[in-house]
Regions:
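Short, surface-exposed alpha-helical segments at coil->helix boundaries
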Residues: 3-7, 58, 232-236
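ATP-binding pocket architecture of kinase catalytic cores
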Residues: 20-143
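An alpha-helical support segment within catalytic cores of ATP-dependent transferases
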Residues: 2-18, 92, 109-114, 122-190, ...
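Hydrophobic alpha-helical segments that form the core
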Residues: 255-264
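Active-site Asp-x-Gly
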Residues: 186-187, 193-252
C-alpha cells in the first residue's frame, strides 16, 4: 500500500496523534506496517484473508492479554469506527531472529527454552470454546496440499537428485501417517516466526505479536517455526519442558510439519514459476531433513 495514503488514514481518524518519524516494516504477506516515532505500531490488512481476521484479532487480544502475563501482546488503542486498521503501543525489545539466537550462550538458550515452553503451555491451556468466536474457520489446508501434490508431483521430483528423491518419498510416507493420527486440538498462535517473538535486553522472552493466523489445531503446530533456528536441541528442550510425556511426539510431528511447510512453499513456487524460490526452498528442505534424519 502507498505509505502516504496510509499516513493520511491515520491523520484523518486520529487528528490528535502527532509524530516525527515513520518506519515501514511491511515485510509480511498480510499487513502493511508502519511504526511512528518507534512508539506506535499501525497495521493495515492488505488482502481479504487479513481483513477478514483483523476485527476478531483485536477482540481476541483484549480477551487473552491478562491470561498471558507477564508476556506482552499487542493492545489496540487506535481503532477507527470501521476497525479496518489499528494501532498499538509497540512491544519493546528485539525480534528473536536467527543471528540473535547464534549469539546466545548455552545458558541463555536453556532459560529461553523454558520461557517459550511456559508461554506455549499457558497459551494452549486457554479453552478453545472461550476463543472460538474470534477464530474463523480455515480453508482445508490439507486438501489444498494434496491438490498441489497431485498437480505438481512430477515437477517437484524433477528438482531433486536421486538421493533426495528417496528422502522425499520417505517424508511423504511419514507425513501421511502423521495426518491420519488423532490429537487433541488446542488454541494455537500458528505463526511463531522469529519476527513475531520479542526478547528484552537481557535475552528473556518479552512479547509475542501477530495473531492473524490463530487457530484451533495440533499443539505441535506452534513448534514448527522453532526449527528455523536449525538446532534440534533447542526444539527438544522446549518440547520437553512443555510436556515431558509427549515431548518426543511433539518434536517429531513439528519437524514433519516443518518439512511439509517447506514443500508447500516449493509447490507454490512451481505454480508461480519462481525459479529462485524453488531453489531456495529445495536447499531449505535438504538442510531441514538432515537435522534429525
Amino acid at each position: 500500500m502507498n505509505q502516504k495514503l496510509l499516513l493520511q488514514k491515520i491523520k484523518t481518524n486520529f487528528p490528535k496523534l502527532k509524530w516525527k518519524t515513520v518506519k515501514d516494516v511491511s515485510n509480511g504477506y498480510d499487513h502493511s506496517v508502519l511504526i511512528l516515532d518507534n512508539k506506535v505500531v499501525f497495521r493495515f490488512p492488505k488482502n481479504p484473508y487479513a481483513r477478514s481476521r483483523f476485527k476478531g484479532e483485536v477482540g481476541l487480544l483484549n480477551f487473552i492479554a491478562n491470561k498471558l502475563k507477564p508476556i506482552l501482546i499487542p493492545h489496540y488503542t487506535y481503532l477507527p469506527a470501521d476497525k479496518t486498521f489499528g494501532g498499538y503501543k509497540i512491544v519493546e525489545g528485539y525480534p528473536f531472529i536467527i543471528s540473535s539466537y547464534k549469539k546466545l550462550s548455552n545458558q541463555h538458550k536453556r532459560k529461553l527454552a523454558v520461557e517459550i515452553a511456559e508461554f506455549l503451555s499457558t497459551l494452549h491451556s486457554i479453552k478453545p470454546a472461550l476463543v472460538s468466536k474470534y477464530i474463523l474457520k480455515d480453508y482445508a489446508r490439507t486438501k489444498e496440499f494434496k491438490r498441489l501434490y497431485r498437480r505438481y508431483k512430477k515437477s517437484l521430483y524433477s528438482l531433486f537428485n536421486q538421493t533426495d528423491q528417496s528422502r522425499l518419498e520417505i517424508f511423504f510416507g511419514d507425513l501421511s501417517k502423521v495426518l491420519k493420527e488423532k490429537h487433541d486440538k488446542v488454541f494455537v498462535h500458528n505463526d511463531l516466526f522469529a519476527d513475531n517473538i520479542f526478547l528484552n535486553k537481557n535475552n528473556h522472552l518479552k512479547g509475542v505479536i501477530d495473531f492473524t493466523d490463530r487457530a484451533i489445531d495440533d499443539p505441535a503446530v506452534d513448534f514448527i517455526r522453532l526449527w528455523n533456528y536449525n538446532d534440534p536441541g533447542f526444539v527438544a528442550m522446549i518440547s520437553q519442558r512443555y510436556n515431558k510425556f509427549q515431548a518426543k511426539d511433539i518434536f517429531y510431528r513439528s519437524h514433519i510439519y516443518f518439512l511439509a511447510d517447506t514443500i508447500w512453499n516449493m509447490f507454490n513456487a512451481i505454480e508461480k514459476n519462481k525459479e529462485k524460490e524453488k531453489k531456495w526452498f529445495y536447499r531449505k528442505f535438504k538442510k531441514a531433513y538432515k537435522l534429525i534424519f
